[in-house]
């Protein structure tokens, strides 16, 4: 009886299903369509790159940069998607470009003169709207840059040869300080101390503890790389950044003490002209109310870290290449003997060292240290047919660019790549345009002087089984040897014992 009563209900429900199903399915279909649209709405972008995927794409993109390092991640994306790629860092659209025409356009124009990075990270470093390296305030940057341009050209450029020769020879005379029991020379420590000494002699002229300051510079640079693109949440958890904050504070405090000593010497000097240099110009501008104390200290810090930070590694890579290529060493030594003979190096010799200059250029092309440049678009633009919105982050992968276009043997180390003049749009180790490296001319002089001075006294050799290509490196803000895995050491053999003793 009961079963019979239920049968009609069963039949009625069954008959209702076809009518109810379309109504219930419609919202599901709409939701599915919406999600599909969101998932793919960025796929229509004209710029190649990973998909947006409901925000998963930007998250993975940023994580990849944090995990691999800036330089390595740029190489990954350019290799995967081409030479003009759209990715994300901190949720912001970022272009990774290794195309010479695009790079030329960006470096040339003033509306790409700003950089990008974590505001919190740059504040920790003292670089937020201060100094010149990562200052993102165009007005403040333009006010500070002339101090660097003046210091890195003119009289300082002329004095660099004498200062650098003296510094190199003084440190080579004390080579035992950076040589272990096996006779292996820690080349990076040697270069860092030498370059810090030369920079101090030219720009600050205050006695300092080279060993101590060099270690602090290394800690500062490690913190800079670690904090530059960290997400904001990282800075909310104090213990995560405590180590880096300590490293930053140590160098900033040390530079602050040196700057105070410089102020004291300036304001108690009988003859001010005896103290005129980069730091003096900054301090006098501070006294006139044109700069703040923070501006002065940060500019001194950035001037003091520039050479030990990048040029030291650059020269180390060059020495490795010389050791690996005997014919190149022979050509360099022949030119040194032809130009100098037995006399000391002079400023007039710089232009005559053509083989040395080609070697330096090829070394920077083949094994760069600074292989990426970070910029931000300050207005809407179109680059090589691609629309670029105001506020877009840009990373120029110049290290990859130098191995893609123009050079006859891009993947080999050979001086043939610079036998003919190279148009500067294809080779930009120091950049050009409004935000080019202010020290590019003095850097070339320093490298020539250091290499000539060292090679005249020593034959260099890598440790057995070591070569530049198989060396463990980290490629983040800059490309450095991984010092945590192996000592950046070489063997120095005197070329002429009597000549060495003369120094």
UniProtKB/Swiss-Prot annotation:
Keywords: Endoplasmic reticulum, Heme, Iron, Lipid metabolism, Membrane, Metal-binding, Microsome, Monooxygenase, Oxidoreductase, Transmembrane, Transmembrane helix. SUPFAM superfamilies: Cytochrome P450. The chain crosses the membrane at residues 19-39, 51-71. Expressed in placenta. Highly expressed in follicles (0 hour:hCG), followed by a drop (12-24 hour:hCG) and by an increase (30-39 hour:hCG). Highly expressed in corpora lutea. Also expressed in granulosa cell layer. Not expressed in theca interna. InterPro entries: Cyt_P450 (IPR001128), Cyt_P450_CS (IPR017972), Cyt_P450_E_grp-I (IPR002401), Cyt_P450_sf (IPR036396), Cytochrome_P450_Monoox (IPR050196). Its EC number is 1.14.14.14. One of its GO terms (molecular function) is heme binding. CDD domains: CYP19A1. It is a multi-pass membrane protein. Substrate binds at residues 309, 374. GO terms for cellular component: endoplasmic reticulum; endoplasmic reticulum membrane. It is an enzyme of class 1 (oxidoreductase). It is found in: Endoplasmic reticulum membrane; Microsome membrane. Heme binds at residue 437. Belongs to the cytochrome P450 family. Contains a I helix thought to serve as the substrate-binding pocket. A cytochrome P450 monooxygenase that catalyzes the conversion of C19 androgens, androst-4-ene-3,17-dione (androstenedione) and testosterone to the C18 estrogens, estrone and estradiol, respectively. Catalyzes three successive oxidations of C19 androgens: two conventional oxidations at C19 yielding 19-hydroxy and 19-oxo/19-aldehyde derivatives, followed by a third oxidative aromatization step that involves C1-beta hydrogen abstraction combined with cleavage of the C10-C19 bond to yield a phenolic A ring and formic acid. This is Aromatase. It comes from Equus caballus.
